[in-house]
């Protein structure tokens, strides 16, 4: 009976997460999104907080690299590829909400769409997304990023991305991630893809 209940619960979680195949402003699989379309900031953020100053990060030991992608080297703090909260240089397609259990909102993306059966995840890039030098962030940057992660990165990045079968460009601002058969239906997949830092192809 317990096994049946857990199986039913997992099915309901997946069904809820994949129930809408239109573009959404966020993705959640344990509850409904708390924040509406077009919200300006998370409720725990003070938009009137002072800007500027110096930000210091404590670090144990030494570091010898600004690049967390290769296997060699020990990168400094603040460049976590998997955690947008701990990456102070590059943004991601989705951003997690700290006051919800499993909700992620479009950041570099302006929308996320998951297939009803979980076989693909689509992202639409924001028109106003820019790099630090002012150049627009494009689908080419997303393609470049995942090519690097899936073929040249260290195993801690490359192996989890075996969930992706291939990428397909749908339009100049839309990209589709086709999911490997064994990972179809896993509600974590859109999050795993969406939180990765996007890299500039031109840099």
What are these model-predicted stretches?
Residues 98, 128, 180-182:
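Short loop segments at secondary-structure junctions
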């Amino acid at each position: 009976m317990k096994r049946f209940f857990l199986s039913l619960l997992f099915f309901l979680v997946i069904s809820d997460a994949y129930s809408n195949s239109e573009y959404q402003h966020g993705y959640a699989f344990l509850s409904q999104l708390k924040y509406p379309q077009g919200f300006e900031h998370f409720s725990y953020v003070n938009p009137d907080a002072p800007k500027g100053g110096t930000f210091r990060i404590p670090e144990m030991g030494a570091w010898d690299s600004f690049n967390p992608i290769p296997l060699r080297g020990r990168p400094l703090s603040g460049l976590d590829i998997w955690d947008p909260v701990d990456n102070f240089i590059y943004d991601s397609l989705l951003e997690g909400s700290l006051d919800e259990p499993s909700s992620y909102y479009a950041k570099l993306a302006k929308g996320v769409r998951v297939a009803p059966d979980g076989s693909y995840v689509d992202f639409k890039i924001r028109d106003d997304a820019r790099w630090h030098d002012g150049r627009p962030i494009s689908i080419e940057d997303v393609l470049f990023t995942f090519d690097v992660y899936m073929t040249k990165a260290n195993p801690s990045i490359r192996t989890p991305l075996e969930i992706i079968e291939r990428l397909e460009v749908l339009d100049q601002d839309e990209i589709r991630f086709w999911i490997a058969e064994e990972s179809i239906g896993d509600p974590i997949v859109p999050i795993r893809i969406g939180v990765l830092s996007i890299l500039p192809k031109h840099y």
